[in-house]
Amino acid sequence: MALFVRLLALALALALGPAATLAGPAKSPYQLVLQHSRLRRQQHGPNVCAVQKVIGTNRKYFTNCKQWYQRKICGKSTVISYECCPGYEKVPGERSCPAALPLANLYETLGVVGSTTTQLYTDRTEKLRPEMEGPGRFTIFAPSNEAWASLPAEVLDSLVSNVNIELLNALRYHMVDRRVLTDELKHGMALTSMYQNSKFQIHHYPNGIVTVNCARLLKADHHATNGVVHLIDKVISTVTNNIQQIIEIEDTFETLRAAVAASGLNTLLESDGQFTLLAPTNEAKEKIPTETLNRILGDPEALRDLLNNHILKSAMCAEAIVAGLSMETLEATTLEVGCSGDMLTINGKAIISNKDVLATNGVIHFIDELLIPDSAKTLSELAAGSDVSTAIDLFGQAGLGTHLSGNERLTLLAPLNSVFEEGAPPIDAHTRNLLRNHIIKDQLASKYLYHGQTLDTLGGKKLRVFVYRNSLCIENSCIAAHDKRGRYGTLFTMDRMLTPPSGTVMDVLKGDNRFSMLVAAIQFRRLTETLNREGAYTVFAPTNEAFQALPPGELNKLLGNAKELADILKYHVGEEILVSGGIGTLVRLKSLQGDKLEVSSKNNAVSVNKEPVAESDIMATNGVVYAITSVLQPPANRPQERGDELADSALEIFKQASAFSRASQRSVRLAPVYQRLLERMKH
């Protein structure tokens, strides 16, 4: 129980972040991760820390909950080991690490933390060892033995060939003339070294990793009588150039150098700050079409967006990445910076050829691919390699490709590839015009669309916007993914081909032979004007077969009661436009009759009052029509006596329906119920 309470307290502290804790001063991310490691070792006794070691390497990490349970660092499996926490040691015959390390001077503490090579090089200088053993309050960021061994031979030779100048200066650059613990190491701060007051950069990341000039702290906060020792994984060197100066002197940045100058971003890259530049090399330009590169280089706004997409808002050293991390660029896009083994990745791709090139105002990683943001792309480039490639091919075949690669302000409504699983339509005049109505004559953003808004298309149609609780639709087609906003155009990914409206609801019903009996009934009850005027209706239209399927007694009863017929017709008309993509699981739609219809959708099959819909989303200028194969009954239907006047009128409307049916279906015999009804009404 005690362990659970402590874990809960730690979880709350991690959730609150470094800015606040439940009690006492805020803990740094490093301290929180160290505390997590202490809690994980309860069964091993006090002062034991759990450490994750990457299999096959000497790399060890104090880790947070996520990494603990995943048992991976940069995609590589780890094993858990248990070591004495910083400042403690084992006692022979005792479990855990009960004894505090005795304090020694800085020089001796170097040996305790495993930096004996630093001790050795300190011995070679005339002045440094006496300082480390004498009175004072210094901090040294001491390279590990492996860090010294990994230095290029020519660099190491230059240091040891002049120990009292080069080597001494290098060691002093790792030192600060005061005591500095990790709780003082703030992200982005600069510490002044003991070498000519040169500065080095500190970065303290939310995952608890602390770096000094991108060298990771391996063991931190080892106290000495005259200071503090931190063990780091690299030998650090002075940094004198800002990001812009490095771009100017590196041969591999010729194209980048010209682009920065043309965009005016050189001022930013010279300024104070802590940026990460993902710097494209000359080779990166070879991986995109020359036409695309020239277009962007010739467009100041697109060029600036492109470069801003390569600049992260904060400095990110490679050693701080142990898993995928979303980072924001100056373009306000997000890139996933991750790792795979020793390789740094961007959006899952290992495109970084050189990492952790330090500048006074940040860090540079060389990349061999351009990261082109959506805001610098044409419509066709936005769609390249996406789930709408079939639609893009159709636009090209229809001769509309110039609209997708030009500088018109447009919005493309592109159906998903899955829409064409049964085959794409042939390119004819009808398809060409239909595709033109999938291009809006304005560059839109879905977040600014509103219910009832009308949009003008290249094909001359006006399309309506419908906003529902869980969907945003344009006519019968709903947006299936976040829109992509390009340089001039925006791409909306749609869940089906769009059908522009043609005619009123009444026009739609009259134009479809399936609804001749319904049309006759509507005309008799004088509802034609309602369904012809401006409005917003959802009509569940019973087909002729639906009326014919009624029992003879039911049909007679319906025709013998004017009010009941009117109520039933109005019950089939909803008071708003509801396309199938806006239904969700269940929608209760108020009808013109007053009662509500229960409209539901499951696995793309629509039903109303649990009756299946035969065809959905027949669009009209004032509504939408659904074909249904049953006649819906209001929940409180009260039959009334039929009058003689109704009988004559009923005969007339069904004569009209019969004539219409004969004209359109001369070779098809009417259903027996329908025939008997017509015969009866002649007498």
From Swiss-Prot:
Span of the annotated motif Cell attachment site: 642-644
Any coiled-coil regions, as ranges: none
One Pfam family matching this protein: Fasciclin
Compartments where found: Secreted; Secreted, Extracellular space, Extracellular matrix
Modified residue annotations for S-cysteinyl cysteine: 65
Entry keywords, A to Z: Cell adhesion, Disulfide bond, Extracellular matrix, Gamma-carboxyglutamic acid, Phosphoprotein, Repeat, Secreted, Signal
Predominant location: secreted
Domain FAS1: 103-236, 240-371, 375-498, 502-632
Post-translational modification summary for this protein: Gamma-carboxylation is controversial. Gamma-carboxyglutamated; gamma-carboxyglutamate residues are formed by vitamin K dependent carboxylation; this may be required for calcium binding. According to a more recent report, does not contain vitamin K-dependent gamma-carboxyglutamate residues. The EMI domain contains 2 expected intradomain disulfide bridges (Cys-49-Cys85 and Cys-84-Cys-97) and one unusual interdomain disulfide bridge to the second FAS1 domain (Cys-74-Cys-339). This arrangement violates the predicted disulfide bridge pattern of an EMI domain.
Tissue expression per record: Located primarily in the epithelium of normal adult cornea, in fetal stromal cells, and both endothelium- and stroma-derived cells in healing corneal wounds. Not expressed in normal adult endothelium and stroma.
Residues of the EMI domain: 45-99
Residue ranges of the TM segments: none
GO biological process per UniProt: cell adhesion; extracellular matrix organization
SMART domains: FAS1
GO cellular component, one term: extracellular matrix
Domain of life: Eukaryota
Quaternary organization: Binds to type I, II, and IV collagens.
Described purpose of this protein according to its UniProt entry: Plays a role in cell adhesion. May play a role in cell-collagen interactions.
PANTHER family: PERIOSTIN-RELATED (PTHR10900), TRANSFORMING GROWTH FACTOR-BETA-INDUCED PROTEIN IG-H3 (PTHR10900:SF82)
The protein, known as: Transforming growth factor-beta-induced protein ig-h3
Organism name: Oryctolagus cuniculus
Gene: TGFBI
